[in-house]
Amino acid sequence: MATTSRRPVLTRTKVLVPVLLVIVLAITIIAIFTRLYTDLLFYRSIDFSRVFTTVLYTRILLFVLFGVVMAIIVGTNIVLAYRLRPPLRPLSTEQQNLERYRSVIEPYMLLILLAVTTLFGLAAGLSAAGQWRTWLLWVNGESFGTPDLQFHRDISYYAFSYPFQRFLLGFLLTAVLLSLLVTLLTHYLFGGIRMQTTGERVTPAAKAHISVLLGLLALLKAWAYYLDRFGSVFSSRGVGTGASYTDVHAVLPAKLILLFISLACAVLFIYNIFQRGWTLPLLGAGILVLSSVVIGGIYPAIVQQFQVRPNEATREEPYIARNIAATRAAYGIQDVEPQDYAASTDVTAQQVAADTGTVPNIRLLDPSKLSRTFQQLQQFRGYYGFPPTLDVDRYTVTGADKKSTTQDYVVSVRELNQAGLGTQQRNWINEHLTYTHGKGFVAAPSNTVDVGRPDFDHGVSGFPQDGTFGIKENRVYFGEMSPSYSIVGTRQMEIDGPGPGETQVTTTYQGDGGVSIGSTFRRALFALRFGEKNILLSGDITKNSRILDERNPRDRVSKAAPWLTLDGDPYPAIVNGRVTWILDGYTTSDGYPYSARRTLGDVTADSVTTQSGNRTRQASNQVNYIRNSVKATVDAYNGTVTLYAWDESDPVLRTWMKAFPDTVKPKSDIPPSLRAHLRYPEDLFKVQRDLIGQYHISNPRDFYSQEDFWDVSDSPDGSGQPQPPFYVYSQLPGRKDPSYNLTSPLISARSSKLAAYMAVSSDPANYGRFTLLKLPAGNTINGPVQVQNAIEGNGDVAKQLSLWRSGGATTIEGNLLTLPLAGGLLYVEPYYVQARGSTGYPTLQGVATAFGDRIGFGASLGEALDKVFGAGAGAAAAGAGIGATTTDAGQDGTPAPRSGQGGAGVPPPGQTALQDAVGDADRAYQAGQDALRKSPPDFTAYGKAQSELADALGRLRTLSSPAATPPAATATRAGASVPASPVPASPAAKPPAPSPSATVAGGDTPGPPGARAAPAPG
């Protein structure tokens, strides 16, 4: 009865289990198909489908090839062990116990065989599929044309072939070890190995089988010793990377001896098939183990201790020389040579004033500190936003005097920020169909402020009107802050920015970016991919609708070129009238002989990357070769990805171009409008900066002493992270004109004193040209951290900081720039002040300068320079000519104002109303400062001064708007006497809101309510 009652349960179980398995299998297949097909559609949309198919086919090939081989090897040994089982087994307690297992297993032997081989095959296949990069490099490897100095093999062997051989060795060792494991288990289970039987414990058949597998292991070990010899070029035993004296004279001979011992062991294992017992193979294995300890370990240690250590500098000298040469070549710093720089501290005011290549261009706006300022002044609507860290780029603009001027700009794009939507606005239609894009390219000269604020009137706001930037399409559908996906071309109109009053301008996407989802099939697939049923069910989606995904520029390029390591900082630029994201792509390798290894994530980390949400930190991958081989662009409107070869001589790039043909365009295809905005990449510079700290030394003896090693200074902000490099437009010693440089100071590894100054040009004519200024040994010039301490310990600075903070405001130190100036080195640091409350934002309130042991602090750069060098030193900073290449010096050496502009803070003749407004602003500011200086501060008087200042600023904006004739300059140039922006002491004292004319910034020109906006300029 009990048996009968269980039958329905067993029957249901037999039916239910297969059904569940079929359901799970179906779901898995659908999920895989959905992912693959939607990925294919994405790759087709960016014209990189060949990348998708090449990677997919390669992974499938490796999965099948190595999975099947593993399954065959393991399965063959299981079958062989089963077939070699003895027909009769001696009676024993052990065998009686095993018989119970055999009776259960044997009926299902085929299923067990399939299960075991499938499991091992899947594991091996999945592991091998992840090695698609190793496979493609091995198959397509191009020659470096340079042999290594130890074995005289082309470096391509180490970069492309050696890694695959190591992978293949590991695979075969795993296969043989797994085979040995299942063989021993099978022989034991079926009586081929008997542990508790007197007499013969291993049958001859089992012995032969096991001996063959052990012989194969010995052969593979011999191959491992062979490869180990070539691996010595990556040894870290010596002073530098690569084969050292001990490696060459002890380890390499030891590896050769061990190789032959392994071959002898393999022969003994095979010979043991015909012998009784295990004496010979065990003896051989013992000799191999003992030899590996004595010859492979103890002997090299003795050589190192008694031959090398007493005379290490002499013994290691030729190998250190190899390391220096290889490292400099592998990291592209072989042509960087230090040049002596006296770094004089005896400089006159006249010399400083005469330096019109650097002083007028000194950057006062810190892109890592002013995101909130851009947000408050240029956001316009809550659903727009700016990334935490802005960018720096240079533009050549033509002034009213028809002269072209190149200068730095702090730039960003006004991106869509859906976090700014209200609670009632958060629904699927708004988030994915209506609020789809950002709008506007925002820029401000980095050396200019407008009463403490970025000078947008002389940045992007004026350019849509005069066409200087030539912006034709300013909508941003692909950006760093874009949502995961948006659907465009629907029946819903897209919000396109503010219109008159509280109205909104609308538009419909007209581009060809993204994937068409007009068909029900595609909508269903994307609904599955994003887990959103509305994609399938929404009636707003039409046959013309497109879905935009993978919208972060870095993610798009990573998809198009998965073989590239991308720089952590994409930056926007105007290229051919369109907002374009520019990214730098690196080809890397860890297979360059004798080259020092670095961990990318460590050497590229600094105080900005560790705190910024839009700067991607590099992965912790070790490399010993890197090239900036690719420049990539992403169109912000249609998402088009374009790859350009930048270093066409790079063999790693040529290898990848062979693996993925027609995906990288030649360097000659780079348009001039793009080339003008290409810059030397930060992450590469940081890697090279770290290495130059040691490898600027070419003499092996000096390198060994480490006496002249340099380090990257800690950031002066107290974060404990390295100081980031800075892009500056400056004139380097020995150069005729200023250039756009990426710069960094270096300090002595043994002290905090400044040791060197490193810069590399980004100008097209001198791109990649390094300048390395080496300061005299024993100099007393402070490093950045010491200078920061000296500035804040200065009495005048401390007093002013205390005054600002007493009103409840926060002081923010900007980037501490180090600049060669008049034969010395000048430090410049802007100071920003931010009021309390949600409306507060940083405004420039002062500038600190340091030269030698002298500190200057003032409301402007010119004032700070005058305090350090004497009266007249800040004349160049006070001039209106930004970019010394276009300014004409007056008789007193001060650059003459540009046509249509007076000097900074000085209105052009005839502009009486403007002069009055500037004067009123100055008086209101001073009144506010006087009110704050009282003890306690007079906030009533301060509020009144704020109102008067707001009124004066309003008149300034009105007079300098396009409707005013003639236009007048309202900006305070670097070093001007117009006061910096006052800071509200309480939330009630808010800064004046941007005037309506400011909405032109970035092309947000107001339009009629509900109008469909055509692509607007700017």
Curated annotation (Swiss-Prot):
It comes from the Bacteria. The keyword Membrane applies. Keywords: Cell membrane, Membrane, Transmembrane, Transmembrane helix. Residues 886-920, 960-1018 are annotated as: Disordered. One of its GO terms (cellular component) is extracellular region. It is a multi-pass membrane protein. This is UPF0182 protein Francci3_3781. It comes from Frankia casuarinae (strain DSM 45818 / CECT 9043 / HFP020203 / CcI3).
